[in-house]
Every structure is written in structure tokens, then in C-alpha cells.
Amino acid sequence: MRVEDHCSVFAWSSLQASRPWPAAGRYASLQAGEDKTGHISAGPNEGILFFNNVFPIQIRKIMGLPMPRILDRLISPAMSGTDPNTVIQRAKAKRNLPIESTEILPRVREGGAFVKFTHDGSTPTSEIEKTLQEYLRDEPVKPWWSPWKRMRAKVVKGRPWVEDMMRLPAPRLRVEFVPGEPGASVTEAVDLSQEQLFQFFRPYGKLSDIVMQESDSKVLPKFAYLDYSSIGKAIMAKNCMHGYLVSEAEGGGKKGTFLRLKYEQKIKPRYIRDWIINHPRIIIPIIAALIAGTVAIVFDPIRTFFVKAHITRTLHLEDNKWYKWIKGYASDIIRGHKRDEDDSYDAIWDDRKGNIEQIQTWLMETADTFIIVQGPRGSGKKELVVDQALQDNKLKLVIDCKPIQEARGDSPTISAAAAAVGYKPVFSWMNSISGMIDMAAQGATGMKTGFSETQETQLNKIWNTTTTALKQIALERRHKDDRDANLADDDWLEAHPEHRPVVVIDNFLHKSHEGGIVYDKMAEWAARLTTTNIAHVIFLTNDVAFSKSLSKALPDRVFRQISLSDCSPDVAKKFVVTHLDADVEDDPAPKDGSEKKLPSQHRTDLAELDSCIDLLGGRLTDLEFLARRIKTGETPNKAVNEIIDQSASEILKMYIFGAEDDGGRRKWSPEQAWMLIKELAQKESLRYNEVLLDDILKTGGESALRDLEQAELISIISGPNGRPSTIRPGKPVYHSAFKRLAQDKVLKSHLDYAILTNLTKIENATIDKCENELLLLSKLRNQPAQTAGRVQYLLAKLSASQVKVEKYETEIKGLKKVMAEED
């Protein structure tokens, strides 16, 4: 139900029975004019007045909504004092106004009401209008909801259209010029001039502008726009002048011209919005800068807080002393006061005590350089540094490069880097969205907006925030009453290396061949930490070529380096035995009073340990694996054989087969890997340059060796001057695994067959090249004597290659026979 149809608002006759107001039904019928025709007619001695300010115009904004009864009463003319009938009665009493109101048609949407009246005919309507206006001016009627605007009244000159459609008033009126005779062509209507329109419409209020239709416009009927200074004035003009017939005397032509009025919603000029839309090259970078500034102001302190909490482990429950006490007490009850298996590492740490003390000494010095701990995978680098050298240092940040480097795509890489340092919140997914926005904006404006950020930029943000957090942590140990309290922050940090946090970067250069931007940025960041004395930086790496990458960040520094090797046989045996005894060493003695024996004392098969360790080697992870298998009840020999078989299977999968599954990232061929396996099965080490002379390594041999070293099939030992000199198995257990693989006749025949086939292709290519050159020389006229030497050289080379081909084919026949007969 619309507001205008809500009879309870306007059932004014119920408020005062004596008033000549229509009943509710009569009122409802008048909303669309008499007999719902949309018009009001006035007969002889009748007229129509339009009163404004009867209802609040703003009520139009909630048209069509159900209105509460209290609002009906508040805006009721009887409550607000704007009842037109009451106004007329007072004017009659005080000014002898000679009219009688007969019907009232309220126009809630327009805030006014039509009043139909009768008079005796002796007084013209212009005098009636003048008298009523003087009364309203001398005794203004101001409703409570508009105390600054008084009620006004005008005689309706036209034939008002009282439609009940949802059309809202506006300060602009569209005046259409329609011919005065029905059925006449619209072109017969007269276009009134601005002066004429001003004369007709200025009495209803101040006009801001009159806009005439463009002369070349073909829109019919012709029209003009009237812009009033307020909506109220436009409402008054529209209701009083709609349907007015401009006579010939007034300039309306012979047949006259009707004025048809309607509200026109004027499009307001939005200069600021238009300027913003029309200048994207200026606005978009400004918006990007504002967003970046807001993010920096809001999120940077939060991120710094979380990074500090990650380093100091403030929010980690497991580091709380009470939690540790409860956990330790509960563990003792559950495990029965058994020793921790980590105690078995004591033998290792005793052997590497010098390395531990060396790292601790370096951390007390001011030298602004890196500390590098290099060793093969599984040699215990992280345990040595984090669990031993930094055992008493609570301010340490451990960053594992492996998940960062193995992440696929920019967003996962950024998320992994942020998680490593506790940087949050991180909106890595926003980079994809901002990238699309940036691309769209670049297509529209021709320039980048700066919304999107590269992976390099976002990594720099993470490292810079971490730098801020590390510096704040280091300076938290500074006190105002210190003797050197007058020093600047940078000078104080340089003078107190013992107060600097320690950053441990683990798995540095892991899979560095897949892209080095992460490692380059990390090395640059680590260089800033050390040169500004904010933190000590320790790199843990398997790569022997680490200096090439780190020298870019610190080109003028000598690195402090510790190289970890495999354990000696004595230390390895002690480690395994200690690991076996760890669980039962604290058990109570037998009740019969006999001496308690440890597993290492009553197990007779431990005599095999010496020979087993010789086969297994001293790699820490392999020794721990051996100890766990022996603890489950396996004999040392069986355990070692299982480990060797497992390593052999691993070698086949990682280095020989499965090249298709590796996505083409391998830079060595299976033949090159097998050649090294076969040679190292016979010898514990190979001479580097001698290996490069092998025919299978003639093309890209050095690159293949470096990649196989990165993949940890082999290890390349350099001499004192840094030149590669020796090739050894990547792990000690690989030597035994190589032997195991070389003893497999079918596998050996299959891979040797591939090598010989490859070598045969190489020699056949050499023969083709020699034959082509000999054919070219044979076409020379009068064979020059100078070509004789070249011909002899080519013939000798061709003959040597032919001998090799025949040899290879003979060997291939034997290999085919083995593959056909063996299972």
C-alpha cells in the first residue's frame, strides 16, 4: 500500500465532524482525480487552490513502505497545523475571504494539497488569491517539521494531472508545447521563448535557468527545461500551470498551445568523480600509494610483533617453564625415568667438541662475516649448531630453505618464507588479484599502477621486517644505567656481539639449480645483518660451492668455515652402542641381586658391528637407522644388508630410471651415472680429470658431474688450491650399494648395453664426419701434396673408430645373450 493510499493519515473528517472533508472512500477516489481520470474539473463559480508545505516533502523517500500509526499522526495536517480547510476558515474570519472549500485532494508525495472551492462570482479569482496570500504572509503557517518555511497558496490556472504513480518531484520541470486543438499535429504548437516562459513561471518562485531545446533537435513535441531554485517552487509551478492554454493573445498561436509539465530528474554534475575517472594515470598510482601506506602503518607493527614473538618464542607454550616442568614430570612417569635417545649423540658431540667451541667463540667476536658449516646431508650440521653450540642462546632464528625453495609459484614461496620467520598476517593470494588489476589498468592507461608486487619485492619486505624485529630484540638488552649508555645504537651493537641474536639458515643452496633468486636475496639480507652488527648469521649447507653464491653478497670478506665429515669407525660404534643402551640404562637392577646387563653386554651378535660399520660408513643418519633396526631385534649384518639394498633401490630410482617422472630437470644421462657407479664399485675414489676423459663424458661431462654432486650420488673433493681432484660416493653406504648393483648381471648388462649403444653412435658419427671430409678432398683436381697428411689423419681416425665400433658390437652381442638367458 502506498502512502497516499493510507487512509488513516488523511481521514481528516474524523478529526472534526463539522469540516467539509470527504469520507475515507471519497478521499481514496480523489487520489487519481475525479472518477480516477487523473484530472480535477472546476465548474462555474468554482476554482482550485494548491497549498504547499502541507506534508513533509522528504516523506517521498519512503514511499511504498508500510508506515507506523504514530507517523500517521505526526505528519497529519491536524497535528502540524497545516490543514488547508482550517487556514481557509481563519482567512474567511479575519479577511472576509468569500469562498467555501468543497473538496480537498492531498498530494503527500508533493507535500501539498488541492482545494476545490466555490465563490459567489462577484470577486475574481485573482483577488481571492491575493487576499489568501496576504493572510498567509501576515500570519504564516509553519509546520513543526519545517519551522523555516511557511505555507503558500496559488490558484490553479491549468488543468492539473493528479496521477498516483511513483514519480518523485524534482527542481527541474520539462515544459512540452502541445497544440491547443485535439488531433492537431504537434508541429502546429508554438515554441514559447525564454521571455514568455519567464513571464508565466516566475511568479511561482525563483528560476535558476531556462534551457531551450536545441534548434537541430528532432524530438517532438518541442520542449524546454525550467530549473527552479528549490523543489517546493517547482511543485507549485507544476501543479498550477500543467494544462494551461496559452492563448493567441499571449503568444500561443491561433489555436493556442497547451503547456504539459512533468518533473525531470536533473543529472547533477559530479566534478570530482568525473576528474577522477578521466585521470586514471594520476589517480591509480595515488590510490596504490595510499593503500601501500595504510598497509604499512597498520600491518607492519603487527608483523614485527609476530616476528619478535617467533624469535623469542613468547607465544610458544612448549617453551614455558611450567609447561616444561609438567611435561618432564609426566614423561618420567610414562617412560619410567628412561634416558632420552638423544643421549646417544653424546659420543658424536664429544668427538666434535672442538667444532662446537669454535662456533661459540666466533659468536663472541665482532667480525662481520658469515659462519658456514658445510657437510654432507645427514652429517648432523643442524644438531651441532642449534642443539649444541646455541643450546644456551634463546635468541635464535632458524630458517629452513628447503620448503621455501621447493614451493611452486610466487604465492607458496612467499607463504613459506613468511612462515619461516613468523611474518603474519601475509596476504600472498592478493598478489594474483592485484596482478590482474595491474594488468587491466595498464591496458587502460598504458602504464603500470604499482598494485602488484614481484616475488623479489615481497621477499624483501619479509626480510626487512625481520631485520627490524632482530634489531629491536638486540637492543632490548640495553639499559640506561650501562657504562656505555651514551653510545649510539649501531655503536652499542658493534661493541656487544654477545647480545646479538643468531640467524641460522639451514639447507642453504638446496636445489639451487632450479632458481637462485631466493638464495640471492637471502644472502644479501644476511650480509646486511652482519655488516650492520644486528645479528650473527650461520649458514648450514651441503653444497661445497657455497662460496660462489655468498661471495656475491660479501665480496670482501673471508668466511669462517667448519667442514663436517663422517664419523670415525670408533665413534660410529660408540654411537650405535650408546643408542642401544639408552632405553634400559636407568632400569632397576634384577630382584635376584644379579648384575644388570645392558643390551651391548648380553647381545653376542654385536661382534659384527665392526665389519658392518666398515660397510655402512660413518654417516650419522645411516648409523641411527642401523641402531634402530638392531634395537628391533635384527642382527647387525641383516640390518646393514637391508640398508644397502634400500640404498641400491634408491640409487636406481633417483639416478638411473625415472627420468620422465623428473620433468626433464636432470642434466645427466643414465649412462653417465651408471659409468660412475660401475667405476666406484671397483675403487673407493676416482681421479676427477681421468673420469672426464671417458668417451661417455666427452659432451657436457663436467656439468653432469656437478649435477650428480648436487644430487648427492657422488662427492667431489677439491685440493688445497680449490681444483677438483677426487670423486667419491655421495654417502659411505653408497660404495657398498654400488658394489651390490654391479653384481646384478642383468642390470649391469642392460646398462652396459645402453652405454655401448651410445658409444657406437658417437663413433659412427665420427666415421660419417671423416667420410664426408674425405669425399670432399677427393673432388679436388690434381690432388695437392698438402692434403696428403690430412687424408692420412682422417683414414687413421676412421680406422680407429671402426675398430671401436666392431669391439662395441662384439660386447653388445655378449650382453644380449646375458639378458636373454638370465632372470
Swiss-Prot record:
Matches recorded under InterPro entries: Mt_escape_2_C, Nucleotide-bd_a/b_plait_sf, RBD_domain_sf, RRM_dom, Yme2_C, Yme2_RRM
PROSITE patterns: RRM (PS50102)
Keyword check for Transit peptide: yes
Record-annotated membrane-spanning stretches: 282-302
Membrane disposition: Single-pass membrane protein
GO biological process: mitochondrial genome maintenance; mRNA processing
GO cellular component: mitochondrial inner membrane
SUPFAM superfamilies tied to this protein: RNA-binding domain, RBD
Record GO terms (molecular function): RNA binding
Protein known as: Mitochondrial escape protein 2
Keywords: Membrane, Mitochondrion, Mitochondrion inner membrane, mRNA processing, RNA-binding, Transit peptide, Transmembrane, Transmembrane helix
Summary of the function given for this chain in its UniProt record: Plays a role in maintaining the mitochondrial genome and in controlling the mtDNA escape. Involved in the regulation of mtDNA nucleotide structure and number. May have a dispensable role in early maturation of pre-rRNA.
CDD domains: RRM_Yme2p_like (cd12433)
Gene name per UniProt: YME2
Family statement: Belongs to the YME2 family.
Chain ranges on the Mitochondrial intermembrane side, renumbered to this chain: 303-823
